[in-house]
């Protein structure tokens, strides 16, 4: 007997008889894969792949002799924060124009207006550029400083340090790339309007003053948030997740980590956990860091300036530190670290590309590459496809396949329409109305559907989920994995055995959307209903992954779980003779 014949006669029939157990095995393997990733045998050590960076290999000279410049900048920033409530940023931008014009640098105040349904915002950015003495204005580096962070805390030390550094940088002739300094009045709307105008894009929601100051291709950049708070902290928090789950090149983080930790002895905060230069990490801490990184990447909400730049092929990080008193903060130590970072980025001959763009950072020493974590979601997608096949082979041959397919397709359209209807409001009553409306649609469908129709609808649904999860995982692994976990009960609904257990799975699937929203509310520290937030980010920031996944993967399960529940409930008895489990 040939191998092909053996597989066809023996293996395939055996697998077909035990599809349910094979599907269950794949699901357990896919879910447990994540718990293997933080082990020492799997993780990789962080290292700089781009040899041209040479992080920390230069002498820094931003020292106490520049204390007069730093002191005057801090005094001015403190004055601007006191005047902000009455005159806004007008006084600050006027003073900045005088400062940089006296230095011989071009300046511009860019006004912009954000208009979307339910929200309107008017603001302005300040832009200046230090031309490279040894460059030809074809490449540049970016230094961004939001005047306030996303919760309204002033960034006095950050603005003062940026002014002092640009004055200091002007005295050196080693720069081969222009240095663009942008000060935003808002950490989200400001970068959005700046990028839209810098790349000559048009959008119906943003109107802005055209940029007169331009430079070459932006290679990389940093955003400084040295926010003034009641508590002082010497820990540097590094933010790197961007919209749609995008990430900057890993070499940018490696450069920051090596310079700030090894050369200037700053502790680093990643995903809410602090790490010191000489400290290690345990399996438990790495697992917690991995989960927090996955949740943050899955949400991909825009709260800092760096989040919008990777979609324009600009590698960007936000460096955040809490400063109780800007005048007692060690500006020179932090400024030397920024100087060393920009000196390293100045060595680049091309865009960062040698290292990874898909990864999870576990601590200051280790990360997980895409080749190690992707099998988990692909195994889960395979289990969904097996579930679709299990329901498919059980249908009667003479049944009209277009009928259940039409039900499935119409359910998707109803869900998308319902999402757009409620995306302009944050009231909880709107969310309840959405839930009840989709539930009512599911009840209506169940009155016209037989159990065979419901089983085929479930087959179509699982097949589409498998394909969509596989595609989304290549763009945002975390989001696809979280959604796959929420949909696990759906794939174990069975019309052939154990009706009570299948009814329980249908109920769990029905409430999975509510659980999903509550989890997001905890992560975002915001309202229970983030529909309006997602719609705003979709229109302004091209953040399309979350709303599209929610419309296509999560909300339809309200309808499908209801139809499956009532089809199972109305079934007179569980079938005992089945083709397969």
UniProtKB/Swiss-Prot annotation:
Positions of short motif Prevents secretion from ER: 577-581
Metabolic or biological pathway, per its Swiss-Prot or TrEMBL entry: Glycolipid biosynthesis; glycosylphosphatidylinositol-anchor biosynthesis
Keywords annotated in UniProt: Endoplasmic reticulum, GPI-anchor biosynthesis, Membrane, Transmembrane, Transmembrane helix
Membrane-protein topology: Multi-pass membrane protein
UniProt subcellular location: Endoplasmic reticulum membrane
A Gene Ontology term for the protein's cellular component: endoplasmic reticulum
Transmembrane segments: 18-38, 367-387, 404-424, 428-448, 468-488, 501-521, 549-569
UniProt GO BP: attachment of GPI anchor to protein; GPI anchor biosynthetic process
InterPro entries named among the record's database cross-references: Gaa1 (IPR007246)
Keyword Transmembrane helix included in the entry's annotation: yes
Lumenal side: 39-366, 425-427, 489-500, 570-581
Function, as annotated: Component of the GPI transamidase complex. Required for a terminal step of GPI anchor attachment onto proteins.
Name of the featured protein: GPI transamidase component gaa1
Gene name, Swiss-Prot/TrEMBL: gaa1
